[in-house]
């Protein structure tokens, strides 16, 4: 049975070329010490909404589960009060 020895050089090169390899994510709300996410803070909420109007998942943004639930509720409240659009078809 033959074993293939892998070089560290090839491993590093593969990680740089891999499109799924990203830098370590962190929770912006934990770093800032936020206790409650406000639905009136539209600039922050827009950072967590994609181009098509969908809420970006926590696995992509790095947001903790506690803050992701608050963020979800805040975005839905802002949409209900017409502060944010539901879809990307409602551009200003």
UniProtKB/Swiss-Prot annotation:
PROSITE patterns in alphabetical order: RIBOSOMAL_S18
Q: Which domain of life is it from?
A: Bacteria
Keywords, ordered alphabetically: Ribonucleoprotein, Ribosomal protein, RNA-binding, rRNA-binding
Q: What binding partners and quaternary form does the record give?
A: Part of the 30S ribosomal subunit. Forms a tight heterodimer with protein bS6.
Q: What does this protein do?
A: Binds as a heterodimer with protein bS6 to the central domain of the 16S rRNA, where it helps stabilize the platform of the 30S subunit.
Q: Which HAMAP family match?
A: Ribosomal_bS18
Q: What is this protein called?
A: Small ribosomal subunit protein bS18
Species for this entry: Cupriavidus taiwanensis (strain DSM 17343 / BCRC 17206 / CCUG 44338 / CIP 107171 / LMG 19424 / R1)
């Amino acid at each position: 049975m033959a074993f293939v020895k892998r070089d560290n050089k090839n491993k590093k090169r593969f990680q740089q070329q891999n499109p799924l390899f990203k830098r370590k994510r962190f929770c912006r709300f934990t770093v800032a010490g936020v206790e409650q996410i406000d639905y009136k803070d539209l600039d922050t909420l827009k950072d967590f909404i994609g181009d098509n109007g969908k809420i970006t998942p926590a696995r992509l943004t790095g947001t903790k589960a506690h803050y992701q639930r608050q963020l979800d509720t805040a975005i839905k409240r802002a949409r209900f009060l017409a502060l944010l659009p539901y879809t990307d078809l409602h551009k200003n």
